[in-house]
Amino acid sequence: MEINGAKMFVKALQEEGVDTLFAYPGGTAIDLFDALYDAEGIDMILPRHEQALVHAADGYARSTGRVGVCLVTSGPGATNLVTGIATANYDSVPLVCFTGQVPLNLIGNDAFQEVDIVGITRSICKYAVTVRKREDLARIIKNAFYIARTGKPGPVVVDIPKDIQLAMGSDEYPSEVNIRGYKPSEGVHVGQIKRALAELK
């Protein structure tokens, strides 16, 4: 079945077991908020400022041992998260911060409330990414939660452009994490071991 990116976002939160979302609405994230309206099992907490919500998500993560989750709009909404993201990074607190973004074709054109939040936060989080294809949305969210909670826990930023939120695509959520990178071989090659031993002699 096909659903839009905003509904896929909600499904992803439910699949990841998110029960509390700290959020502040705005134009480039409004479709995500609309999709959350009927979502079951997710309590939305709406502080009066984005900085308050990121610190609240940090406190939630520290007190529950779960990933704290934020949702804000682009521009000042996103930049108001920066201190909280840095705090979570320095204290190894798992957060996933979702930011709305202008449509892909407007990125780099100085559009209203366009800001390079990935560039701003890259040095203060474990991973920051802009979703550029609707078919990558579910995988990126799955990876974001995995990255936030594994190894040294910390914050992850996922920037979702408005056209990705509206684009139609599969409703399938991945069951496994798929991150490109080094995957060590678990088997041994006897011939290579013999050759290495021979070279040591």
Residue ranges and their predicted role:
Residues 1-201:
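N-terminal alpha/beta PP-like core and its mobile active-site loop of ThDP/TPP-dependent enzymes
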